[in-house]
Amino acid sequence: MSSPTSSLDTPLPGNGSPQPSTSSTSPTIKEEGQETDPPPGSEGSSSAYIVVILEPEDEPERKRKKGPAPKMLGHELCRVCGDKASGFHYNVLSCEGCKGFFRRSVVHGGAGRYACRGSGTCQMDAFMRRKCQLCRLRKCKEAGMREQCVLSEEQIRKKKIQKQQQQQPPPPTEPASGSSARPAASPGTSEASSQGSGEGEGIQLTAAQELMIQQLVAAQLQCNKRSFSDQPKVTPWPLGADPQSRDARQQRFAHFTELAIISVQEIVDFAKQVPGFLQLGREDQIALLKASTIEIMLLETARRYNHETECITFLKDFTYSKDDFHRAGLQVEFINPIFEFSRAMRRLGLDDAEYALLIAINIFSADRPNVQEPSRVEALQQPYVEALLSYTRIKRPQDQLRFPRMLMKLVSLRTLSSVHSEQVFALRLQDKKLPPLLSEIWDVHE
């Protein structure tokens, strides 16, 4: 396997290349304003690590407003400038002026042209918003406006055409002609989503579903890019040394656990951007993440499986065979099911939108342990199930079993999750201690 050096999303203790030891693989997860690494052994507090990485990074509030916008009372104020708000725009309660300003800034790249004559910390109000565009854009982002919610001119044009087509009366049917109307393609999704006829005839994604899919795919891309930039500090895979030596075995184990930490952090970052997740209470957020993380990791592993080489590639170019997994300390009883599941997922041929929707459905599983509001979780899951059903019927209208096959993979993941628990127990018997974040999210009690 290739073994370039790599990096964690959160710096490892020591601010240098990690060594193949237990403490070196522990992530440094800082609270806001905290400058020092947590002391060794600080993993004892319940859910401390998960709570910190769940905190919104760039917002003054604890939770972002997600999902359907609540009804306006008529006296709400813009979160950016304090003027009268007209509704929720780009995920934030704001006025028409700030809505239009944020859209123009994103579409026309205004951030690169704006400048502040002051210190970059101008206070925003209805007067000052016209004086300093840079600080106004900064305040928009601090309030929670999201660039991925802004549609391009082409996407808006397609939506207008689609809306006009929906308002027009349907043309008279001519069965003898054999022609069929194709559903409109979703902006931001592959053209394959509009192909086909037969059972998929007349099915279209709603505007809300299109936006949902765009947001999920964009969020995944953003999280993946962050992981790619985090390579340099992962413990290098040992090359040239005696593969059976104790140091080499420890180094391989450290390498894999650090990749797992990157994956966990990527999953948490993605979950925070899934519409509806931050509406849940903190306890339910933690419960859902603890239960779903390993299953999402396995989905992402399957996504990176190469059926020709029978290897799995993490980040940019970390490629691993079955033997590499075994050399890192994993058991054959866990490795073989991973590769079997990856091959099965490969045969389904999911695209980015389908993977993103399937992961969102997995996150909102109401039957997870310790969930306080299962009915609310189930309600949040339903739109993603409906979007995936419509999307698959549009993409593969002749394959009526595609959607149920996808959902059955979530059942397979439950079995794999149980096998993973046995693997973690086996690692403990081998006296291989997991880093605090992994111990906490997988409920490993030392």
Swiss-Prot record:
Belongs to the nuclear hormone receptor family. NR1 subfamily. Residues 1-28, 175-196 have a biased composition (Low complexity). One of its GO terms (molecular function) is nuclear retinoid X receptor binding. Nuclear receptor that exhibits a ligand-dependent transcriptional activation activity. Binds preferentially to double-stranded oligonucleotide direct repeats having the consensus half-site sequence 5'-AGGTCA-3' and 4-nt spacing (DR-4). Regulates cholesterol uptake through MYLIP-dependent ubiquitination of LDLR, VLDLR and LRP8; DLDLR and LRP8. Interplays functionally with RORA for the regulation of genes involved in liver metabolism. Induces LPCAT3-dependent phospholipid remodeling in endoplasmic reticulum (ER) membranes of hepatocytes, driving SREBF1 processing and lipogenesis. Keywords: Activator, DNA-binding, Isopeptide bond, Metal-binding, Nucleus, Receptor, Transcription, Transcription regulation, Ubl conjugation, Zinc, Zinc-finger. It comes from Rattus norvegicus (Rat). Sumoylated by SUMO2 at Lys-395 and Lys-433 during the hepatic acute phase response, leading to promote interaction with GPS2 and prevent N-Cor corepressor complex dissociation. The keyword Metal-binding applies. One of its GO terms (cellular component) is cytoplasm. Its main location: nucleus. Forms a heterodimer with RXR. Interacts with CCAR2 (via N-terminus) in a ligand-independent manner. Interacts (when sumoylated) with GPS2; interaction with GPS2 onto hepatic acute phase protein promoters prevents N-Cor corepressor complex dissociation. Interacts with ABCA12 and ABCA1; this interaction is required for ABCA1 localization to the cell surface and is necessary for its normal activity and stability. A zinc finger (NR C4-type) spans 78-98, 116-140. PROSITE patterns: NR_LBD, NUCLEAR_REC_DBD_1, NUCLEAR_REC_DBD_2. GO terms for biological process: cell differentiation; cholesterol homeostasis; intracellular receptor signaling pathway; lipid homeostasis; lipid metabolic process; negative regulation of cholesterol storage; negative regulation of cold-induced thermogenesis; negative regulation of DNA-templated transcription. Residues 1-69, 160-201 are annotated as: Disordered. Residues 75-152 bind DNA. Signal peptide: none annotated. Coiled coil: none annotated. It is found in: Nucleus. Residues 1-76 are annotated as: Transactivation AF-1. Residues 205-446 are annotated as: Transactivation AF-2. Residues 208-446 form the NR LBD domain. The gene is Nr1h2. This is Oxysterols receptor LXR-beta. There is a cross-link at residues 395, 433 (Glycyl lysine isopeptide (Lys-Gly) (interchain with G-Cter in SUMO2)).
